[in-house]
Regions:
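Short linear capping/connector segments at secondary-structure termini
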Residues: 29-32, 86-87, 158-166
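Alpha-solenoid helical repeat scaffolds
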Residues: 118, 145, 149-152, 158, ...
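Bacterial Sec-dependent N-terminal signal peptides
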Residues: 1-28
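An aromatic- and glycine-enriched ligand-binding surface/loop that stacks and positions planar moieties
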Residues: 21-79, 153, 209-210, 220-382
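Short glycine/proline- and charge-enriched loop/turn segments
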Residues: 161-167, 239-244
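Secondary-structure transition into beta-strands, especially the periplasmic turns and strand N-termini
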Residues: 5, 17-19, 120-129, 133-136, ...
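Conserved, well-structured interaction surfaces
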Residues: 38-57, 77-150, 164-204
Length: 382
């Protein structure tokens, strides 16, 4: 009887615990998908997340794009290939370009779907048009990165469900189809003034109309180049496994060069109208204690080309990467080697041009150094 009484008491206490308000979470503070479009700041943060998949080309640790004719560095991740250290278990060494690109495209399309649900109370129609334009630019740019890395690649036109099997993904499209799609998205981005000509202040680094024009120029140049324009030597058998169609054009087209030239000339003209230009002596401003004058104007121009000018923005840069440089960034690898400790530790000149690059420069007479009779080729290192 006592056991039964104790059991009933315990059971009653458990019932009280289950019905109390102490353990209830009111309100539920877990983030919901709808929170991403409840405020202007949240929507802008969602847009900025679409930029988060841009490759960090300044980080030398992931610089598989470096080639020996451009620069020489030591102890970088890509050296694992030549030393034979790279193995299937070494996946941590790679920058995983493939996944990053497609995740970025997926994020952009998800953002566009969410943007449709945003109330005008938080984001005006004009801002929506601008945000949509930026995401279209990024979709185009990510497809360009995929084409640059892998040639004929997939074209993604909308959100793909995460549960989609491999068989449900689109196959590779031809280079001509990829080029057409990229330019279609860029035209959408630039339509109705969606992209501004330039940004300044905290918005510096976001997509602009000039960046879109520059990208169109680059894409058409790829399409016209011998790599993809009539390359029968390397890609005669590069066909779709499904229907056998050619993925890279086998007939040279002069029209592609004409289109490339027209697009490039237009991009240059528009950039110059916006007051962008090659860096000159005057852009560095007058000498000061912080910026002492150098005896040679060319040295002064080179010194400040990338780091300083009167307005704070380099007039050569059309689309800037404004992310902070990290420990392994290119800036840390360029200054002369430091022997001091503390904050200077690790700074060293580990990035430098190769002799092959230096010898590729022409003389003042416009000739290769081994062809110019006025240049003392035998004593070139003296």
């Amino acid at each position: 009887m006592k056991k039964i009484a104790k059991f009933l008491i315990v059971l009653g206490m458990m019932g009280q615990l289950s019905s109390c308000d102490y353990l209830d979470i009111v309100p539920d503070e877990r983030a919901q998908e709808s929170d991403t479009w409840k405020t202007e700041g949240a929507v802008r943060g969602y847009l900025y997340s679409c930029y988060g998949y841009l490759p960090a080309n300044r980080t030398f640790g992931n610089s598989y794009w470096l080639a020996e004719e451009l620069t020489a560095v030591t102890k970088e991740l890509f050296t694992t290939f030549k030393y034979g250290y790279y193995r299937p278990v070494s996946l941590g060494f790679t920058s995983n370009t493939w996944s990053t690109i497609w995740n970025g495209i997926h994020q952009c399309y998800m953002f566009q779907e969410s943007l449709k649900q945003v109330s005008n109370e938080y984001v005006t129609d004009e801002m929506k048009k601008q945000y949509l334009a930026e995401s279209n630019f990024l979709i185009a740019y990510y497809h360009f990165l995929s084409m640059r890395s892998y040639g004929p690649t997939m074209i993604i036109r909308s959100v793909i469900d995460l549960e989609t099997p491999i068989s449900g993904f689109p196959e590779r499209s031809s280079i001509d189809e990829v080029v057409a799609f990229i330019n279609e998205k860029l035209d959408e981005a630039m339509s109705e003034g969606g992209l501004p000509t330039t940004w300044s202040g905290k918005d510096y680094g976001r997509a602009t109309r000039l960046a879109a024009l520059a990208l169109k120029s680059r894409v058409y140049l790829y399409a016209a180049s011998p790599l993809y324009n009539g390359n029968t030597e390397m890609y005669a058998d590069f066909r779709s496994p499904l229907d056998g169609r050619q993925l890279i054009a086998q007939e040279k087209s002069q029209a592609k060069w004409e289109i490339s030239a027209t697009q490039t000339k237009y991009a240059i003209d528009e950039v110059e109208k916006a007051k962008f230009h090659l860096y000159h002596d005057a852009d560095a401003g007058e000498p000061s204690d912080a910026k002492p004058g150098l005896p040679n104007k060319a040295q002064r121009r080179l010194r400040y080309t990338n780091i300083d000018n009167q307005t704070g923005n380099n007039p050569e840069i059309i689309w800037a990467d404004t992310r902070n440089d990290d420990y392994y960034g290119i800036q840390r690898r360029c200054p002369p080697r430091q022997t001091l400790g503390g904050k200077f530790a690790g700074i060293s000149m580990t990035n430098c041009p190769t002799l092959q690059t230096i010898e590729a420069f022409y003389t003042k007479n416009g000739l290769p150094i081994n062809k110019d009779k006025t240049f003392d080729y035998d004593e070139r290192y003296e």
